[in-house]
A protein has these predicted regions:
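Bacterial N-terminal signal peptides that target proteins for export
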Residues: 1-6
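C-terminal motif of bacterial Sec signal peptides marking the signal peptidase cleavage site
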Residues: 12-15
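Bacterial signal peptide processing site
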Residues: 17-20
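Acidic/histidine-rich, surface-exposed loop or edge segments in extracytoplasmic proteins
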Residues: 25-32, 125-131
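N-terminal segment of the mature soluble domain
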Residues: 27-73
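Sec/Tat-exported extracytoplasmic proteins
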Residues: 49-53, 100-104, 124, 148-160
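Surface-exposed short loop/turn segments
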Residues: 68-113, 117-135, 151
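C-terminal/domain-edge helix-coil "capping" segments
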Residues: 128-163
Length: 163
């Protein structure tokens, strides 16, 4: 009976169109990643490209395209206060400015900006736990920003006229 239930569940999942996201493909054979400022997003982009169809080029001369991280900043601001005037929530934000150009230096993606944010509650009784949660949320935002950049490159590449 359990085999029938498992087979039925598998059939329902495949019928709904569910599939795993898979590797982030850019449609490029090689991509060089550089950063004008210290950037954890650039590190995350390199990590996401490892093992995928797009190879990481050592320099822009050897690459089909170049991704430049122009700026990256994080911010933590008070979102809300309690009735006693104590911090209740913080807003964490990440801004990344980037540009993509081809091997000839022509812009494929004009300078663009991604801004991500998360709300985190604050607790005076567990400051170390909240600090760890904050770092985890920033890491998650960096990963999401890297994925968005690579997907944007893939969309622009897919919509580019054939040469």
């Amino acid at each position: 009976m359990s085999r029938v239930a498992a087979a039925l569940a598998l059939a329902l999942l495949s019928a709904c169109g569910f599939q795993l996201r898979g590797d982030v493909g850019t449609g490029l054979k090689t991509l060089a990643v550089s950063n004008d400022v210290p950037s954890q997003v650039a590190v995350e982009v390199r990590r996401q490209l490892t093992g995928g169809p797009t190879k990481l080029a050592a320099n822009a001369k050897d690459a089909e395209a170049q991704l430049r991280i122009l700026a990256e900043s994080t911010d933590k601001t008070i979102q809300s206060l309690t009735g006693a005037g104590r911090v209740f929530d913080y807003r964490l934000s990440l801004k990344v400015r980037y540009q993509v150009s081809d091997a000839a230096g022509k812009s494929i993606v004009d300078p663009a900006e991604i801004e991500l944010w998360r709300i985190i509650s604050y607790s005076e009784t567990a400051p170390l736990a909240k600090e760890a949660e904050e770092q985890l949320l920033f890491a998650e935002m960096r990963s999401e920003a890297a994925t968005r950049i690579l997907r944007r490159i893939a969309v622009v590449r897919a919509n580019a006229p054939a040469r």
